[in-house]
Curated annotation (Swiss-Prot):
The protein, known as: Small ribosomal subunit protein eS32
GO cellular component, one term: ribonucleoprotein complex
Keywords: Ribonucleoprotein, Ribosomal protein
Subunit structure: Component of the small ribosomal subunit.
Region feature (Disordered): 1-25
Note: Initially thought to be part of the large ribosomal subunit. Crystal structures show eS32/eL41 to be a small ribosomal subunit forming a bridge at the interface of the 2 subunits.
Name of the encoding gene: RpL41
Database matches in Pfam families: Ribosomal_L41 (PF05162)
Family classification: Belongs to the eukaryotic ribosomal protein eS32 family.
Key word Ribosomal protein present: yes
InterPro entries named in the record: Ribosomal_eS32
GO molecular function, one term: structural constituent of ribosome
UniProt-listed GO biological process terms: translation
Amino acid sequence: MRAKWRKKRMRRLKRKRRKMRARSK
């Protein structure tokens, strides 16, 4: 159960990181 929501959270974090990087550039 924990692994399931953890995977979803990781994906969201990755998406946020991508947006932040683009803004920095």
